[in-house]
Curated annotation (Swiss-Prot):
The active site is at K118 (n6-amp-lysine intermediate). One of its GO terms (biological process) is DNA repair. NCBIfam families: dnlj, PRK07956.1. The keyword Manganese applies. Disulfide bonds: none annotated. It comes from the Bacteria. Zn(2+) binds at C414, C417, C432, C437. It catalyses: NAD(+) + (deoxyribonucleotide)n-3'-hydroxyl + 5'-phospho-(deoxyribonucleotide)m = (deoxyribonucleotide)n+m + AMP + beta-nicotinamide D-nucleotide. This is DNA ligase.
Amino acid sequence: MPDREKAHARIEALREEIRHHNYLYYVLDRPEISDEAYDGLFRELVRLEESYPALITPDSPTQRVGAAPAEKFLPFPHTIPMLSLENAMSEAEVFEFARRVRKILGDRGDVDFMAEPKMDGLAVELVYENGELTGAGTRGDGYVGEDVTRNAKTIRAIPLKLYAGAGGASPPARIAVRGEVYMDRKDFAALNRSREQAGEPLFANPRNAAAGSLRQLDPSVTAARSLKAFFYGVGEVSGYRFKTQAQTLEQLRRWGLPVNPLSRVCPSIEDAVSFYNEIAAGRDALPFEIDGVVVKVNSIEWQEMLGEKSRSPRWAIAYKFSPHQARTRVLDIKVQVGRTGVLTPVAELEPVTVGGVTVRRATLHNQDEVERKDIRVRDQVMVRRAGDVIPEVVEVIGEARTGGEEVFQMPGQCPSCGSEVVRLPEEAVHRCLNRNCPAQIKASLRHFASRDAMNIEGLGKNIVSMLVDRGIVESVSDLYRLSVETLEQLPGFAGKSSRNLVESIERSKKTNLADFLYALGIYHVGSHVARLLAERFGTLDAVRRASVEELMSVNGVGEVVARSVVHYFSLPANRTLVESLLSAGLEMAATEPEAGPVDAFWNGKTVVFTGALSSMTRSNAAALTASRGARVSDSVSRKTDIVVAGADPGSKVEKARQLGITILDEREFLERLGM
């Protein structure tokens, strides 16, 4: 047999053997060989493919890593929308869900359920054609996500080719499988240790780490992050039909896709609640983070009969865990200054572990919130991760006070620039009005360079601080005058890093109107509103000349947003900034209309906000939802469609539950905004 034929036969044998061991390791959790033996097989395959490059195929295990970094993510449309789930926070709500299911199904027989741990990761959809992985996308807004195919192929838990040799049916001609990419606790801790040693910012939790790792423009970064995945369902399928959710999971497992081994068929809703209690009791001992249990009607036929509501299926519910809480001490209260000049008090805490995550600080929102909760320096407090993600101070332990606690008072001068701090009558926040405030300049630069704005890679927090503190950059327009020689003078900024940043800044000159408008940081103009304006007016000049009435004629743009845009372009300093950017050579391509019904969730809905939001003011949140076609109301009634609940929401949430109104916590609210 010629050498090439021998090599071909050995390559095929090695690929099949490696796929087999991947299946045993990632799906069955029963490895048969040591890591060293596996590495030996992999290295042999690499050597053979290097010797015979014509024999390399896209589904080879060696092809997971190596693609060049992309400049941006392409859209990934979902043929069947990836809906979110209705939440339940109590047994009563789960039993009510089961009652609704039985009412719709009538006397068709006893209903059994599939109960699955709710992974706290990033939702993804993988597309396999004739068994080979051809596409992968994030959930996005449920209709269109981001194409992360190249990155998904670097995750060893995701098979490049579905495994048909473990029994059961062969893979269909085309199937879209859905699941969660996650990072387990051990790998998360190791990643943060390495980032701390390198002087890089730490990830707040494993979910953020997983999302940030998958959504990398450079696949080699994703490959180095030890991501894993569990799969729980399917979207589009051709030529194949599943009978039950349990069968779906088993068949996915047989094809080589990891499924959560803790999932269980429950003959009754009472059994599903018992499963929840069992999982909740042992959640901290699991190697990965979960934030609840998803309960699904097991029969696929009955799922189809039950159908969907506008945002969620009627046949499933997410029974969420109560937030983790822990006791700690307030060491200090520091004030942060944002890009719009808002001063936000932040509690510096004695490090405490809350739900597997070390919490060192928590936002206190504003002076009113500090006074309402009476939070003082050196207080003993209870801290929780709201939505199991955002740290917040729940309450002060009053009986632990010794008399040595200090009352917090918002400073009269900006901690960054020393300018007078003001509180406008209609706002709950204090502001620094100095446009030359270093903290605001730094925050504006980070916003301008962010992925959804000018997308300048390499312009991180540390380099921004050095540029501003040394007086090299005083405005975003100064970025376009940076040279390699200037950057090389900064400590730790080697030649390659300097060249890469200058090249990234140069690439950002080719942008579009929507991204540019968002990058300017106009009050109330998020990325979605910026796109609406770009699609309606087409050019920057047209937006600058538009009146309040003309802006309000855009569907999704209200009076608050319109006046903010007009005010921005009326200020001489802003007009000078825009002209400086244009003079630097920025070129704006036409903005294409958005793909898919991205406003379907908010459009026409009546929304009520209650409680404090940590990520923005309620007025900003109201403006964002209004810009998407929603109507914001102050009171809950039968006409209310959605209640957004922040910290300490009060009676509105209970009334919403009684009326069966959809309730979103802050994390879900941000996800629905695509933030």
